[in-house]
Amino acid sequence: MCIRDRKKSEGLCVVSFSWIFAIILASIPYLFFGISPVDALFEATSGITATGSTILTHFNYPNTVFFWRSFTQWLGGMGIIVLFIAILPQFAIAGRQMFFAEAPGPTEDKFTPRIKNTAAALWKVYAGLTIIEIAFLKINGMSGFEAVCNSLSSISGGGLSPNSQSMIGCSYPLLWITAFFMFFAGVSFNLQYKAWVKLNPLVLFRNEEFRTYFSAIFLIGILLSISLFFNMHYDLAGSITHSFFNVSTLVSSTGFCSVDYTKWDYTSKLLLFAIMLFGSCASSAGGGLKVMRWLLVFKIIKTEMTKILHPKAVCNIKTGSYSVPKEILDQTLMFVAFYFVILGVSAFLIAVLEQNTTIGLTGAVSAVGNIGPGFGAIGPLGSFAPLNALTKLILIFDMLIGRLELIPILVLFQKDFWVLKR
């Protein structure tokens, strides 16, 4: 194994074991409140990976428990490893390789020359948005404690709320404020930083991935609003508000809810399930397959169709002005295939264990995509507590590999990874 490969392996190894260690540490406080070890591990994994699934069946715990849940999500949203690099300069083992492993999804570039500067810049945007959201929620009538917890949860793409009803019953202004910040939780923080530096929001719309992300939310939001208006008989304001709130929460993998959408009609639930698979932008706090990968997959399909019609055509696949190398395209196809294999296997195992295909399918999608709630018994007002212990362990594994984008965890199971050749 060459020096470069070994450094990359070190980065992957440190990332994986740091997350596992962080999850174990995060689970300890739950044990003091009578929560079983498996459930404590599940809740901690859900927090650190910013998934938002919960095993809590009541909310009679002290506020410290709910703050801890929200804080673990906030740390996990951008990535504990990036935080370490930003505040612990002496932690310099394979720094760039760790950022490569941690940054979610394929990225266009590293926008500052030093990795520590990059991490610090990302955290300035992340912390700044959090503080702004807390202020807006408090000004619009939310209690100070809930404003802090919900802001930590929404900007991280987590979704664990101190309120058993999530955000059901909140005023429309509170829902729109939260939806706005959830939307940006799913936007590349690299891109947001550039927009802040240039004081020009139009920078966002020059990015192809952002335009696709924005368009998908707008399109699904409009279709869902129409469905709610005609099929569920919401008024116009209610249909638009609940539509865009719940689309934003699922596409950014946050997991809040403004209503129990499991009671919606089939068409509305199908639209929500579609946006669950879509995912957020690369280098965002959100989860899912990532918009950039969908873009590349569709461009690959379009290119192959062109080659069928014009065999001698020379086709380059680009994102913006960047020509994507074949190696990245191959990796993207491999990742997408592997992603759906993991989803399929997990859904099958969970469906068999729970004897419920809805729990199996939506549970796997929500765990690997770090979304949080699914449909049925594990919907936004449900709990994962009644599930089989083995099901919870499968979901824990899914949440972790989903947050680390499959490869850093799965590569640990390769024998060659542990063999250091000269």
Where in the sequence are the language-model features?
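Membrane-proximal intracellular helices of multi-pass ion channels
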Residues: 4-422
